[in-house]
C-alpha cells in the first residue's frame, strides 16, 4: 500500500514518527489519506475527512463529475464487482427537482444508467405502435379477402388446367407484363408482402374473369409458350462453320464490330451469334490456359513422395508371419528425400518363425 501511495503522489513522509516535534511532519507535506478524503468533484461539495482512502488508492478511475453526463441528471455510484462497499459518506447530494428526473438505481445494487431516454422518442414509438382501430380492422378485412381470393385462384387454375407458369404468361399477353411461376406460387401461398399482394390482386382478378369468359385463352397461352420456347432455343453451328470460326479466332481473338459483321456475312450467320461465339471462345481459352498453368506448376513442384520405395527393417525380435510365407518382414516407406546411391540402408533379413509346431 505504501509503495502504491508513493507512486501516485509526489509526497514523501518524514523519516521520523508523527507529532509536532522534530520527528513530526515537515512543512509542505500532506498525509495522502487525508488529502484524498478531502477531494471532491469540481464545483461539488467536498467529502468529509476520515472516510478512508479514495478510489485512486484502489486503482479505480474516479467517477466523472455529475455535470459531465446528460445535463446533470446522472448519478455517480459505486460499480458492481470491484470489491468496494458503498458508504454513506461517499454519496453526492442532488437537488430534489433533479432527483425525479434522474435515472433510478437498481434495487440489486447494479450501477445506474448514465442518462435517461428522451421522452419524445418514447412518444413517437408509442404513436407508431398505437394504430387506429378502424385502420387495423380494415387491414384485417383485406387480409381475409386476399386469403379467400388466393384459394379461389388456385381452385380456378387447377379446374381449367392451367399451370402457374401459364398464368404468368397469360398475364403478359393480356396486360403486357409477364410474371414468373415463382411469383404466382408465392401469391397462392400468401408469401408475398401485403403491398405486393394488393398490387397483384387486380391483375389476377381480371385473369379469372378472362378465363371464365374467353374460351380461346388456353390457345393464346399455348402460343405464348411456344414463342418463349423459341426465344430460349440454343443456336447450333455446323462443324464446317465452327472450323472457320476457330481459324479466325487464332488469327484475331477479339475482332471489332466491323470484322464481326464481315465474318457474319461470309459465314451466313447473325452478328449476335458471331459475337457471342467469340466471347465464349475467349472464356474457354482462359479456363484452359489456367488449367494448363496449374498442371505445369504441379509437375514442376513434383510429387511430395519423390524417389523409389525404401525398405526399412523392423525392430529386432521374433516376428510371426503368415504360414507358408517365409520372406523377411520389411516395411516399405516412401522417403521425401531420395537417398544417394550407395547410402541406402541395406535390407537386413530377420528370422521369421513360421506356424507353431505341435509336439506329442
UniProtKB/Swiss-Prot annotation:
Domain POU-specific: 138-212
One matching Pfam family: Pou
Record InterPro entries: HD, Homeobox_CS, Homeodomain-like_sf, Lambda_DNA-bd_dom_sf, POU, POU_dom, POU_domain_TF
Compartment list: Cytoplasm; Nucleus
GO BP annotation list: regulation of transcription by RNA polymerase II
Biotechnological relevance of this protein: POU5F1/OCT4, SOX2, MYC/c-Myc and KLF4 are the four Yamanaka factors. When combined, these factors are sufficient to reprogram differentiated cells to an embryonic-like state designated iPS (induced pluripotent stem) cells. iPS cells exhibit the morphology and growth properties of ES cells and express ES cell marker genes.
Presence of keyword Transmembrane: no
PTM characteristics: Sumoylation enhances the protein stability, DNA binding and transactivation activity. Sumoylation is required for enhanced YES1 expression.
SMART domains in UniProt: HOX, POU
Glycyl lysine isopeptide (Lys-Gly) (interchain with G-Cter in SUMO) cross-link, renumbered residues: 123
Domain of life, per lineage: Eukaryota
Positions contributing to DNA binding: 157, 164
GO annotations of cellular component type: cytoplasm; nucleus
Chain segments carrying region DNA-binding: 180-186, 193-196
Region (Disordered): 1-53, 87-117
Positions of the DNA-binding region: 230-289
Biased composition (Gly residues): 17-26
Coiled-coil zones: none
Keyword annotations from UniProtKB, A to Z: Cytoplasm, Developmental protein, DNA-binding, Homeobox, Isopeptide bond, Nucleus, Phosphoprotein, Transcription, Transcription regulation, Ubl conjugation
Modified residues annotated as Phosphoserine in this record: 111, 236, 289-290, 355
Family, similarity comment: Belongs to the POU transcription factor family. Class-5 subfamily.
Domain-related comment: The POU-specific domain mediates interaction with PKM. The 9aaTAD motif is a transactivation domain present in a large number of yeast and animal transcription factors.
Subunit composition and interactions: Interacts with PKM. Interacts with WWP2. Interacts with UBE2I and ZSCAN10. Interacts with PCGF1. Interacts with ESRRB; recruits ESRRB near the POU5F1-SOX2 element in the NANOG proximal promoter; the interaction is DNA independent. Interacts with ZNF322. Interacts with MAPK8 and MAPK9; the interaction allows MAPK8 and MAPK9 to phosphorylate POU5F1 on Ser-355. Interacts (when phosphorylated on Ser-355) with FBXW8. Interacts with FBXW4. Interacts with SOX2 and SOX15; binds synergistically with either SOX2 or SOX15 to DNA. Interacts with DDX56.
Function: Transcription factor that binds to the octamer motif (5'-ATTTGCAT-3'). Forms a trimeric complex with SOX2 or SOX15 on DNA and controls the expression of a number of genes involved in embryonic development such as YES1, FGF4, UTF1 and ZFP206. Critical for early embryogenesis and for embryonic stem cell pluripotency.
Name listed for the protein in its UniProt record: POU domain, class 5, transcription factor 1
Gene name of this polypeptide: POU5F1
